[in-house]
Amino acid sequence: MEYIVMDLEWNQNPYGKSHQHSDLPFEIIEIGAVIVSGDRKEIIDSYQQVIKPRVYKKLHHKIEEITHFTNEELSHGKDFKRTVLDFLDWCGDDYMFCTWGSMDLTELQRNMKHYKLERIL
């Protein structure tokens, strides 16, 4: 078994909670991950992809401050659906997710549900 150590970045509505999408309070804008071999505990591959936002197209000022992304950079990102399918293919068949934050898997599942991809996990 391999370990997928994953870190997601996400955006939120720049105009506050009262304007957020009801089923998507946070929209993933980047997936970063490494594969760590289960037996050797070595990094054997890495993955990184910026995602073009579809719901919150303008960066929240705090997210911009933390991630150093610009709206211009995000406008050149890949589609979320394509990125998630590529990412899960990259993960392989026998893996366990490990995350830097307690919300990463929750937000991945929420974003996948929003884009009607929840059945592929």
Predicted regions and their residues:
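Conserved non-catalytic scaffold segment of RNase H-like nuclease domains
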Residues: 2-106
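Substrate-recognition/cap helix-loop segment adjacent to the acidic, metal-dependent catalytic center
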Residues: 103-121
